[in-house]
């Protein structure tokens, strides 16, 4: 019987999940993972719903509940996901659940089996990723309760960036803070890792070269990659740094925080809420965190929010190209990167100095390659697959344990 793995990406009021089956390629020479189902459990107001699509994108299951439920969202949702899986795929041998965990701190540079000791350490990282880590942990606890006999594997967004040289990890603070773990971690590592894997399949020469990847979504960051390894990232100690995001401010003069504390008398909790939940595109536009709504809006504030978003991407692109001492390829991924032709066009405008010439018709069609044939630097649009990477890591870790 083929092994199956469930992947979970838990947020505050949602759980993205997927069921993968391991099999052999048509040639029978290598193992491959096939997505059997991809779903979303979410809570909107008092309504709790689960929607599932098959690997081809067709909806195969949907259920909604509006009555009051006393059970915590994550625990109740995972029990319902388990019940659906047992009904829809009764013969699937689920050997593990793989979890996206945003922050792994200094201790974890590779996936690990979740133990009580691991969970204890992850709790200490909540202040570094308050929008994600508490809910990642809640997802793990809910999965443990729902599936007590299934291995739980934590896969970290920070792990891919542990190849950074010291100079790209350190802050100009007294050295003791670095030794205590105050350093640049970088995030979206599972996404970047998948992009490297996919690039090796479709453009191996570029994958072995100097690549800048822009993961642009509600969370946004950029990464410089050389020979498939992370060299530098726009994010730092927390997932707040770097590019402006849907509701997060991105790069900010630390003096602004001191001003808010000293002059505005704002508490740490108030500043946290401001920087994580009320800033970014939402704060600048006064309208929405959603790029689609901003592109459709005709207000000056919405256009200025987009302009600032593009400006920061262009500035980061130039800096990362300098870190790499040149650039062979650019990759756009994430919800905005994959779908907003306007953002991509504005980011690449005037980038001939790094060898980019845009094919406007290909860009408008969201083609896989959007640079012209004359472009020295190749530009790709590649849908990312964090769930697939989690599944691969999870099964690989089980294989390592079995071989030990």
UniProtKB/Swiss-Prot annotation:
GO terms for molecular function: acetate kinase activity; ATP binding; magnesium ion binding. ATP binds at residues 16, 215-219, 290-292, 335-339. Its EC number is 2.7.2.1. Pathway: Metabolic intermediate biosynthesis; acetyl-CoA biosynthesis; acetyl-CoA from acetate: step 1/2. Mg(2+). Can also accept Mn(2+). InterPro entries: Ac/propionate_kinase (IPR004372), Aliphatic_acid_kin_short-chain (IPR000890), Aliphatic_acid_kinase_CS (IPR023865), ATPase_NBD (IPR043129). Keywords: ATP-binding, Cytoplasm, Kinase, Magnesium, Metal-binding, Nucleotide-binding, Transferase. Its cofactor is Mg(2+); Mn(2+). Mg(2+) binds at residues 9, 386. The active site is at residue 157. The record marks 188, 248 as: Transition state stabilizer. Pfam families: Acetate_kinase. Belongs to the acetokinase family. Catalyzes the formation of acetyl phosphate from acetate and ATP. Can also catalyze the reverse reaction. This is Acetate kinase. It comes from Methylocella silvestris (strain DSM 15510 / CIP 108128 / LMG 27833 / NCIMB 13906 / BL2). The gene is ackA.
